[in-house]
Amino acid sequence: FSVNGSTAALLAAVSASVNKGGKILVARNCHKAVYHALYLRELQPVYIYPHEDQRLGINGGISPERVERYLEENTDVQAFLLTSPTYDGVVSDIKTIAEVVHRHKIPLIVDEAHGAHLHYSKYFPVSAADLGADIVIQSFHKTLPSMTQTAVLHICSDMADVEKIKRFMGIYQTSSPSYILM
């Protein structure tokens, strides 16, 4: 659980997945907390841009083919992070993206802050936690009846270093959490 919202969970996920000074493939439309992690860990971002939906004037999803191309061109990338669903509700093909990312032996981190509700109806898209992502971050307060700042970091595979994540969650969260939020 995170009582410092998805921000602390994103900081911890990135910090635990990429060595200081390392490279990470990052969707350009990611949350500012990811940029804070890049700065704090002195990471080298490789930006991948979502396609633009001209008709709606919003960012679309990220294609698995584009992910494959970027990973082939950047073999020293240590993780891939994308946002799905986006702030506009666009969902990328997480299952196929996870297969691509895992062929390159790196973890897939999905910022699913706006998708905590996905588990609760067959009419919603499937959560990244069920589609092969290694780390999934959800903000309960964005789409569920929960207090502001409540979020979770799901560890979905052995590619996520649990001990590192625990250590960084301890660094990035308050040492005096509100029991009301927990």
Question: PLM features: what roles do these ranges have?
Answer:
Residues 4-182:
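Conserved PLP-enzyme active-site core in the AAT-like
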Residues 1:
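Glycine-rich active-site/cofactor-binding loop and its immediate structural neighborhood
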